[in-house]
Amino acid sequence: MVGQITKTFKFSTAVTSRDLISLNKFISTEFKQVRYKMYIMDGSIYDTDDINQILEYDNPPLRKITKIEINANKVAKDFYLLPDFEISLSDLSKSSYSIKYEIRNVTNKELDYYVKKIDEFSLNFKSSYSILNSPQFFSITVVIFLIIIAIFIAFLSKKISLNHYVSTVAALSAAIGFVLAKLVPSFLYWLYPQSIFCIGKQEQYYENKKKLRNNIFVGFFLALMVGILGSVAVNYFMK
């Protein structure tokens, strides 16, 4: 009995040279004919049968990798026909999925084995900050900010009427909620891209972004501590 399957994943990914080499080693062992395609941000496409040409790709800032495809066959045949195996590693910001693979023309036992192994490789590509790119995280962040705003206003406005308090909270929540809903996702996507290809010179690019991320968070917490200590000092001396 011959079967086939198609699976997709939508989590954030970090495609590193190490994980790509590991995946390629498995595919090259199981299949006899392997070919690669690399899609670039400017629209160009590269076709090769040598994985090293992808690993050594010198990608300038405006020509970053957006997708890598690996196609393979059990026996040599024309790749214009549907291959026995294909996997796409895509930039989630430009695609409806980050990983998609299809397996065809294999037995039931082979299908179970391949699905288990490719699922494992796919999870290896999942970024450590994948949760930060989920819609649920954005929603929770906005709600938390709105709760903090409501508490802050309640603390400052103990003497105003309930109606005035409710209308003030509602107006500020709507305005700030709208701003957060727009700015938070954009800021997080900038700091934590939905998909990255740490291959070639892009490795250094994302290392620099990681350092920038750390500096931003250190600066944020230092500013927060200074603000708290300043508030305590003002309250102490104003007594």
For the regions a language model picked out, list residue spans one by one.
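Membrane-proximal, non-transmembrane alpha-helical segments
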Residues: L89-S139, A154-V166, A170, A181-G200
